[in-house]
């Protein structure tokens, strides 16, 4: 029986053009650039003027071009997201439609910030079954939709964006070599949007509002523990030492979490690719965006051993060891882009900020 692997042959990202800076946030929140940077490492984040599926499509188009794979060759699409345009149907089918793919398996996957690692594991195993040849794995989020812009602790953290990779079937030992995904359900309520879904009263007067539960200190402890243990497990299973890991692509949630993860794993911090300063926490999109930029910036070389680690609501966690293939140079490039946005980030958010603050005043 042939042993198949799933090599990453293409990579792409899509970040909205509109930037929301820390200074912008300080115009309507009790915060400052220094306060945010020293606690999170974040300087800017992007605010989308389009739907999640639009960003996912552009990221996929760039990944396809760089892989040299035609859309018609794709037979599997997985979109990791917790902020889809619609619940029914899934947005993987919308991406499929946008790309002009007539027939492919297409589904969404919600594991919050760990979603891309879950998707990478799922896509790899399906390709290894021998039933699929090329897959698009996407992490895409429009988290600005959920944010209570009157709550400083969460409003400063999140942003919008999408990243994608193409997985291609090969007999070379490359791609995902070891992975571990899991969930610590005892802590599911400390990071949640609890009243969004069928549990909400759809006829309530204020059903346009919902809480974003975020217990920062507890999340920090569980994130470091979950990602750290998973990282050690996959390193041991792959029979690699920390010295043999060339690049770490961590979930970009907080610079302190990234630094602590490296310290606990015994991996030098300079091996970790960090771009949280530019985009904030884009949930399932952080890992593929970081992976794409690491390749673009020359941080990834042919044959490199890579460690991916993520943690998210649920509380989901995961880590993976990847071996990069022989190519870091794109086969082609795409000119795909989002439509221009003539509004600033503050203009895009003006109504949401106003209504969130009115709600808080009414509660007092």
Curated annotation (Swiss-Prot):
Residues 252-256 are annotated as: ACP-binding. The active site is at residues 113, 251, 281. Keywords: Acyltransferase, Cytoplasm, Fatty acid biosynthesis, Fatty acid metabolism, Lipid biosynthesis, Lipid metabolism, Multifunctional enzyme, Transferase. It is found in: Cytoplasm. One of its GO terms (cellular component) is cytoplasm. The keyword Ribosomal protein does not apply. Its main location: cytoplasm. GO terms for biological process: fatty acid biosynthetic process. Catalyzes the condensation reaction of fatty acid synthesis by the addition to an acyl acceptor of two carbons from malonyl-ACP. Catalyzes the first condensation reaction which initiates fatty acid synthesis and may therefore play a role in governing the total rate of fatty acid production. Possesses both acetoacetyl-ACP synthase and acetyl transacylase activities. Its substrate specificity determines the biosynthesis of branched-chain and/or straight-chain of fatty acids. This is Beta-ketoacyl-[acyl-carrier-protein] synthase III 2. The gene is fabH2.
